[in-house]
Amino acid sequence: MNALFTTAMALRPLDSDPGNPACRVFEGELNEHWTIGPKVHGGAMVALCANAARTAYGAAGQQPMRQPVAVSASFLWAPDPGTMRLVTSIRKRGRRISVADVELTQGGRTAVHAVVTLGEPEHFLPGVDGSGGASGTAPLLSANPVVELMAPEPPEGVVPIGPGHQLAGLVHLGEGCDVRPVLSTLRSATDGRPPVIQLWARPRGVAPDALFALLCGDLSAPVTFAVDRTGWAPTVALTAYLRALPADGWLRVLCTCVEIGQDWFDEDHIVVDRLGRIVVQTRQLAMVPAQ
């Protein structure tokens, strides 16, 4: 099967309710190349929901095109790879902000409910340090922890997830994107602090876009690896912010947490592009795997 990210994000419009023009229905497919273990990758579903909201907004004749600047997703159950239906409803059409509801279903059962805020992300001029050269083009304030820790490209020795890789049995995204984690960062720090997981990623065959950047906001192995809990860690809720559209090249992903409890843990991702700009931030609540 085709493993291209653009294919995974493709949507086919289905018959919608003519009496409700704000509601549109699409069909998509996330195949085995977009799975973690036997189940569909949560970040891929977030990206697909975001695309459905964006597409529904455009289909309603709204101009200019808006991007999914925020996605708040609740995960009700984990679907299998295959065909999915996305039911969208535009809740607000505004001059700067619009809002859409999206339900991703499989077999008549809702797997993800997402509220997508559509707007215009930042457009900072490129700079080596992520800032622009002209007044008004740089962030007013930025505390970007990634640029000091991670180079724009993965160093030699940081290999992609694929056959023979330590994570290949769990992460099946290698056909569709090049994911290169620093395995040593999956462990807790020697002083007992939570892990600071580092990885690089880019889609194969195409440049990274807003949707791939959103997927990267859920790309790291769970931080529970640091406490030897490496089983299934289902995400319950995830919020993602698209801060800017990524430049072509590698995306740097930094994954951290505040607390791993007995039952619940939090996990944050910061995604930075080749130019050093923050393009996505996410925070999720998930369940700690059993021992």
Swiss-Prot record:
The lineage of its organism: Bacteria, Bacillati, Actinomycetota, Actinomycetes, Mycobacteriales. One of its GO terms (molecular function) is kinase activity. It comes from Mycobacterium bovis (strain ATCC BAA-935 / AF2122/97). PANTHER family: CHROMOSOME 23, WHOLE GENOME SHOTGUN SEQUENCE, THIOESTERASE DOMAIN-CONTAINING PROTEIN. This is Uncharacterized protein Mb0510. InterPro entries: ACOT8-like_C, Acyl-CoA_hotdog, Diacylglycerol_kinase_cat_dom, HotDog_dom_sf, Sec_Metab_Biosynth-Assoc, TesB_ACOT8-like_N. It holds the Pfam family 4HBT_3C. PROSITE patterns: DAGK. Residues 68-205 form the DAGKc domain.
